[in-house]
């Protein structure tokens, strides 16, 4: 039995402002130098490993530094996603319009990647870039090795088929069940690599 409670977090940690700016520009369809984005993501990864170690995190991860957002990165790895749609506002934003306005004001002060207008399913879903997940894992392993920090455990995140199905509207499949089944097959690639 452990003599203390191990500390961890949900996975996504704040990204540097410059990196967020690159992700925001890319998410809005702007031109982004891929080499610059990749280098900024790797730099942020190394920094976030150090931050977790220095702040006593026992179970660490890559902070999702090399992804623009928790599930939006899948548009670069899965076929069949495209276009945009506007997700309905969350219940707390409907119940508290003053809070919604404050969130909107804060978002206008800095670059942000919004998950409120994600892509939708417009074709058959399959995983087409396993090498991107493999590279993310390799970068994390390299950062841990080079930085030399020892954590009790480490992990990487991947979204569930359910959150992707709920967030990325189906405009292709005959049923949500069929959409969910193909998402599960595609995301299994990520799970097995991780």
Briefly describe each language-model feature range.
Residues 1-193:
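Domain-level signal for soluble alpha/beta catalytic cores
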């Amino acid at each position: 039995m452990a003599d203390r409670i191990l500390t961890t977090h949900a996975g996504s940690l704040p990204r540097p402002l410059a990196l967020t700016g690159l992700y925001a520009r890319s998410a809005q369809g702007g031109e982004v130098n891929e080499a610059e984005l990749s280098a900024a993501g790797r730099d942020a990864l190394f920094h976030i490993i150090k931050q977790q170690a220095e702040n006593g995190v026992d179970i660490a991860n890559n902070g999702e530094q090399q992804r623009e957002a928790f599930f939006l990165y899948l548009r670069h790895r899965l076929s069949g996603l495209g276009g945009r749609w506007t997700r309905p506002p969350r219940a707390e934003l409907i119940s508290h319009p003053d809070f919604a306005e404050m969130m909107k004001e804060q978002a206008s002060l800095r670059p942000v990647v919004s998950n409120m207008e994600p892509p939708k399913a417009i074709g058959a879903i399959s995983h087409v870039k396993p090498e991107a997940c493999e590279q993310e894992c390799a970068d994390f392993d390299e950062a841990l090795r080079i930085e030399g920090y020892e954590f009790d455990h480490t992990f990487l995140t991947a979204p569930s088929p359910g959150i992707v199905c709920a967030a990325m509207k189906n405009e292709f499949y005959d049923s949500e069940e069929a959409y969910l089944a193909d998402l599960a097959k595609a995301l299994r690639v990520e799970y097995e690599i991780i």
